[in-house]
Amino acid sequence: MKCNIQVVICECCVSKPALLDIPALRKIASEAGNVTSVVVADAVCDGENLSDIIKEAKEKEVDRAIVLACHKRDVDPSLFKAYARAGVPANLVEVVNLREEVVLPGAAEPERAQAKAEAKLNAAIARVRMLEPLEKDTEEMRTRNIVIIGAGVAGRAAAEVAARSGAHTIMIEKTGKSLKSPGILMSHTTVIGGKGYGGNFTLRIKAGEKVEDLDCAAVIVATGGGWATLKGPLAKACKDAIPLFKLHEKLESGIVPTGPVVIVDTPDPSGKNVKVQDFAWEESLETAARLKKANPDTDVWVVFQEMRAFGLSELAYKEAAELGVRFVRYDKPAPPKIDPKEPAKLTVKDSAQAEVISIKFGTLVFASIPANADNERIADALRIPMSPEGGVRRGSIQRWPVSTPRPGVFVCGSALFPKSRAVAEAEGTAAGELAAEFVKKGEIEFGGIIAKVEQEKCSVCLTCVRTCPYEAPFIGEAGKIEIKAQLCQGCGMCAGICPSKAIELLNYTDDQLGTEARTLLGGDF
């Protein structure tokens, strides 16, 4: 196939640490067939470098590109947009992850790393020659509604920003909170199901005994952290233990708890879905300082396995220490314990002093935040993945910090994992802006890298229907499997599991992958 290929080598990704022979890679690329342009850039994500790359691509009439850099998810999206303006669609821009697959693991063996990099370059060139432009279609959005699930700090920030951008917002809150909302607030309401895709979602919501459908274009998950029933050996031994936010509420009401007060950073050292993050650390420090100010004679202890004072929280740590708050650090193998026979005494081994300390307390406080129990149900309804900690998984911490892998679904605040108020508010603002920008387009784009069915081979075994997490395959009018392009996310699970080999993933067909593999392994099979 006649084509003009541009090869871009990102020195930022492939030469730090200095390992690969960049001139050798450039020579191989320039001598390969169909390669008309080779560019070595300091950083492909840099605006000035990107302009030079695209300028040369236009001059050489490039219609395909190979970028030797880092993981595709970490490459600045502006790279693909710039290539699209130059007439090179995103599916014809092949990103080779030399940093994670070659440079970092091969640091101790430079020669093998160089050989692997050269092999991957040749394989990418062979693969790109086989690629074809893929068509995309558009569909009009039925509504411009943005649904925010959760009316906490992050949810309210998202709603305010989205509303200022002209979007119609609907906040869904499971409690009976009476809040000022820029749009509609649906309290005592939960999301129990959902269908559709980014731009045209339909959520099944329940308010009391009433169940109804709600159409929306985008969804922001802002469920917050979970304050579930405290579990674990400490909570079982001390029935009167309270979570940190309850102590905070008491202080706000002017109630000073009975001392001494012990704040422990985990309710269950052996439990799951418990994450102690900057929120808990910051709140622990500030609350401990407030306790000492309210009653200087009260002994306050902070017992922790790990603590980090982010940013200005360092001042809170310094203030708490100067006020007389005592800090005790323990090691994970030796967590704090409470003897059921003495439920008002906590025993812990101070790792700094290498001695066991017994602390008699009047109030025991747990600082950690379990994942919200609603996350799993909401993630299942929206067909989005979850993190091991029980939060919603985002696309990329570097490029998509408040986006999920699914278009039109955003996430912020402690729905990801526990956050401080400031961070939750900032993420809510970002999610609101992105959601508003998404619905402002008024139409959705779909197609490109999606699954395709050869119906002559289809045996209608329904394996793909049961496997697809997005419900894209369905039985069409001809009695064979078809793929709903708007739902397909191009994950390739159906293509990989189809026993009849009736499904292929466009841009990753058997011929394309076979050519790449044969070139990479240096054989004809």
Which stretches of residues belong to each language-model region?
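Residues forming the flavin
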Residues: 1-525
